[in-house]
Swiss-Prot record:
NCBIfam families in alphabetical order: L9
Reported function: Binds to the 23S rRNA.
Name by which UniProt lists this protein: Large ribosomal subunit protein bL9
Xref: Pfam families: Ribosomal_L9_C, Ribosomal_L9_N
Gene giving rise to this polypeptide: rplI
Keyword Transcription attached: no
Top-level taxon: Bacteria
GO-annotated biological processes: translation
SUPFAM superfamilies: L9 N-domain-like, Ribosomal protein L9 C-domain
Molecular-function GO terms, alphabetical: rRNA binding; structural constituent of ribosome
Organism (species): Helicobacter pylori (strain Shi470)
Annotated family: Belongs to the bacterial ribosomal protein bL9 family.
HAMAP family: Ribosomal_bL9
KW Magnesium (keyword) present: no
InterPro entries found in the cross-reference section: Ribosomal_bL9, Ribosomal_bL9/RNase_H1_N, Ribosomal_bL9_bac/chp, Ribosomal_bL9_C, Ribosomal_bL9_C_sf, Ribosomal_bL9_N, Ribosomal_bL9_N_sf
Length: 149
């Protein structure tokens, strides 16, 4: 019996491969546990179409992320905070605050706090470069200017 593997199966093959297996193994284990489907032309063509559609969707998402990085690189986000006598901020600037201010000043950019790489909260005035990882290997950066109120 020929089956189309839906996921990697040890000692048999990887997802998307068509394998020849014994009837009992195919019916009682692979198909029963949804690790494979009976390999008919219809099933194979449907699987290939799904894979192609998924690849196109990922390519579109990656292009959108690259466009967002280009936009981010032109931005300098200004944040006004109260400052103490020694020049340090009253409270630190965190990922959450950065995303909120970014949405306020640039509504078209939809960043999540998990996309921002901030090693430690910002506790003093100055210009900082913030790294952003958007997935699909897309990395960018933008600047934050922290000024006293």
């Amino acid at each position: 019996m020929k089956v189309l593997l839906l996921e990697d199966v040890k000692n048999l093959g990887k997802a998307g491969e068509v394998c020849e297996v014994k009837d009992g193994y195919g019916n009682n284990f692979l198909i029963a546990n949804k690790k494979a489907k009976l390999a008919t032309n219809e099933v194979i063509n449907k699987y290939k179409a799904e894979v192609k559609k998924k690849a196109e969707k990922e390519a579109l998402e990656k292009a959108q992320k690259l466009q967002m990085v280009e936009t981010l690189q032109t931005i300098t986000l200004t944040i006004h905070k109260k400052v103490g006598a020694n020049g340090s901020l009253f409270g630190a600037i965190t990922k959450e605050e950065i995303t909120e201010r970014l949405k306020e000043q640039h509504a078209s950019l939809d960043l999540d706090k998990k996309d921002i790489e901030l090693k430690h909260p910002i506790k003093s005035t100055g210009i900082y470069e913030i790294e952003v990882k958007l997935g699909f290997g897309v990395v960018g950066a933008f600047k934050i200017d922290v000024v006293a109120e």
